[in-house]
UniProtKB/Swiss-Prot annotation:
Gene source species: Vibrio parahaemolyticus serotype O3:K6 (strain RIMD 2210633)
Protein name per the record: UPF0283 membrane protein VP1870
Main location: membrane
Family annotation (Pfam families): DUF697
Compartments reported by the entry: Cell inner membrane
Length: 346
């Protein structure tokens, strides 16, 4: 009979050493190649601007029309009316036809009022064309290295925009510039100190009209009436923006400006804004909680905001600076929040 083996006591440390000696590949050094390097990715919380928003920077101004044509037609019409009035008065006096003389006086007065209104519209159209010329001149100065023209140009812009000499921003700008500054630097300071104040007021106007239009369409069951009211409010918004920037508009100049705004909106792809708005709804976890009517109101509000931003770009005297440009996303968030607050189902 064989002898029994003596007992063996295994310690935990000895076992670990034995395992490490049996499998040395577990502790061997590993070298990663460049392709296997892991790069941490930073997650951005803010939504990246869409290509449609970046296209807002490009402004398409209306082409200058034939100034001589409108002036010639107006002068010819005014001359013929005056000639006819004088001839009719002379004929009525010679024939002692006092009734005809009275009618001639009445028609001449009405024609004079009409000519005055037409002349006023032509004058406002000319001022709007001059405003666009100032914008183009500002773009040239911003991208040039010239010296000596910036101060005179900005003072002219302030006069055209109705900026008073007592304006704090304008006074600060005057005390900040010196002969060593280039024209581009002077325009940059004028934009940051004077025009930026107008931009803040204009942004409030656009945001207010956009949110109100969105809420109006979202809660009202009358689609046709809503669209008429929205169209009227858009005209009102453009009028308010023109007052902020000191651009006087008449009926003809207002239509010309509105056409320019629509051209810019079409060029920027305004029809794709509903996709951006839908992404905002998803990000706010509102999908399935708002009605189709609320979606329509949201679309109207976004389009109103874009119309307002395009009007701002056409009405402000200087081109947008990238770091101070009003973004569509700022107003869009306010519109989405407004629609969500009044249409979310409990």
């Amino acid at each position: 009979m064989s002898e029994l083996k003596q007992k063996q006591i295994f310690s935990e440390k000895a076992l670990e050493k034995e395992q490490q000696s049996d499998s040395p590949e577990l502790t061997a050094q590993k070298t990663f190649s460049e392709k296997e390097t892991f790069v941490p990715v930073k997650i951005e919380e803010d939504r990246i601007e869409t290509e449609q928003e970046l296209q807002l920077e490009h402004v398409i101004r209306p082409r200058p029309g034939r100034k001589w044509l409108a002036t010639s037609v107006f002068a010819t019409f005014a001359g013929l009316v005056g000639w006819q009035a004088v001839d009719s008065v002379v004929t009525a006096v010679q024939t002692a036809d006092w009734l005809a003389l009275g009618w001639v006086g009445f028609i001449t007065a009405v024609a004079s009022l009409g000519l005055g209104a037409i002349g006023k519209e032509l004058w406002k159209l000319r001022k709007l064309r001059n405003h666009f010329s100032i914008q183009e001149e500002a773009e040239l100065l911003v991208h040039s290295d010239s010296v000596g023209k910036g101060k005179v140009f900005c003072e002219k812009v302030a006069e055209e925009s109705g900026v008073l000499a007592e304006n704090p921003g304008f006074d600060r700008w005057q005390n900040s510039i010196n002969p060593a500054h280039s024209d581009a630097e002077i325009l940059d300071m004028y934009d940051s100190m004077v025009v930026s104040q107008q931009d803040k007021l204009a942004t409030k106007v656009v945001s207010q009209h956009a949110t109100e239009s969105a809420a109006l369409v979202a809660v009202s069951p009358l689609a046709a009436a809503d669209m008429l009211l929205v169209a009227w409010r858009n005209f009102k918004m453009i009028d308010n923006l023109s007052k902020v920037y000191g651009v006087e508009l008449g009926y003809a100049s207002r239509i010309k400006l509105l056409r320019a705004v629509f051209v810019n909106m079409a060029a920027a792809g305004a029809s794709e804004l509903a996709i951006d708005a839908g992404m905002d709804l998803m990000s706010m976890d509102l999908a399935g909680k708002v009605s189709a009517r609320a979606g329509q109101g949201l679309g109207v509000g976004i389009l109103t905001a874009r119309l307002g931003l395009k009007a701002m770009a056409l009405l402000r005297p200087l081109p947008w600076y990238p770091d101070r440009q009003v973004k569509l996303g700022t107003i869009r968030k306010a519109v989405v929040a407004k629609v969500a607050s009044i249409t979310m189902k409990p």
